[in-house]
Regions:
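N-terminal, intrinsically disordered charge-dense segments
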Residues: 1-4, 16-26
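General beta-strand structural signal in soluble alpha/beta enzymes
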Residues: 45, 105-106, 131-132, 162-165, ...
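Serine residues within intrinsically disordered or low-complexity segments
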Residues: 12-13, 24, 35
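Structural motif
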Residues: 70, 128-129, 161
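Class I SAM-dependent methyltransferase SAM-binding "motif I" and its flanking Rossmann-like core
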Residues: 133, 139-145, 149-200
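C-terminal and late-domain segments of enzyme folds
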Residues: 42-67, 77-88, 96, 176, ...
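Short, positively charged low-complexity motifs
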Residues: 6-8, 19-20, 32-33
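Portal/gating segments that form or line small-molecule/metal binding sites
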Residues: 78-139
Length: 228
């Protein structure tokens, strides 16, 4: 049975309580994806590469841990981008999950009003996997912060998988570079695209770490950091 172990990079800037927290805390909660293991709850986040060939095998293993998976994808974080970019994210997600043979629907909700639409909430009530793709994390969290949507998101968190890439990963932490996250991973700041770019994000985050309680989780491309 194929297995894939997600990787976590502990950056050189992570020392003292930061490195120890990663090594002895969440690090110990990582596990090998195994299709024989049935999960009730998981958060899975990656730095970049959502819906692309490089992450296909990881997604196949990841989503096989849920019985009767029904995936909803949201490109809401890119809701302020062009129509062409919206279509790009939609087509990428649709083709990706079709190739995996999974039941899937892409939700075209660009903002808070569209997120709170009845058809979106109805689909959320049927799903057990939600995947947020990349874009602007502040726009994403502002858009999904409605009572009806959050009630369903928390329900899915308890019975299935919440997945996110880039901006979709950043919102899972307690603090973001700008603003606050959902606090599903407490005492954390999540940095995507680690080793690619955005080094100013990392340096700014380290400054925050030196002032307070927030821990740094750096995410690479095509790997998942998972919490169960």
């Amino acid at each position: 049975m194929p297995r894939l172990r997600p990787r976590v990079r502990i950056p050189s800037s992570a020392h003292g309580d930061v490195a120890e927290w990663l090594r002895s805390g969440l690090q110990n909660r990582l596990h090998e994806f195994d299709s024989r293991r049935r999960l009730k709850e998981m958060i899975a986040i990656t730095g970049s590469g959502e819906f692309l060939p490089g992450i296909k095998n990881a997604d196949k293993s990841l989503f096989s841990t849920i019985d009767n998976p029904y995936v909803l994808t949201f490109s809401t974080a890119a809701g302020k981008e062009s129509i062409e970019r919206q279509e790009y994210w939609k087509n990428l997600a649709v083709n990706h999950f079709k190739s995996l043979g999974l039941r899937h629907k892409h939700i075209e909700a660009k903002n808070k009003n569209e997120i709170d639409d009845k058809h979106v909430i109805d689909e959320m009530s049927k799903a057990n996997i939600v995947y947020f793709s990349g874009g602007n994390p502040q726009h994403l969290i502002n858009s999904i912060s409605t009572k009806n949507f959050m009630n369903e998101l928390i329900r899915i968190k308890k019975i299935g998988i919440l997945a996110g890439c880039s901006a979709g990963a950043m919102i899972m932490g307690e603090k973001m570079i700008k603003g606050t996250g959902l606090n599903f991973i407490k005492n954390s700041i999540i940095i995507p695209h680690y080793g690619e770019s955005y080094y100013s994000w990392i340096s700014n985050t380290v400054k925050l770490l030196n002032k307070g309680k927030y821990k740094l989780i750096c995410l690479e491309k095509d790997t998942y950091f998972t919490i169960t």
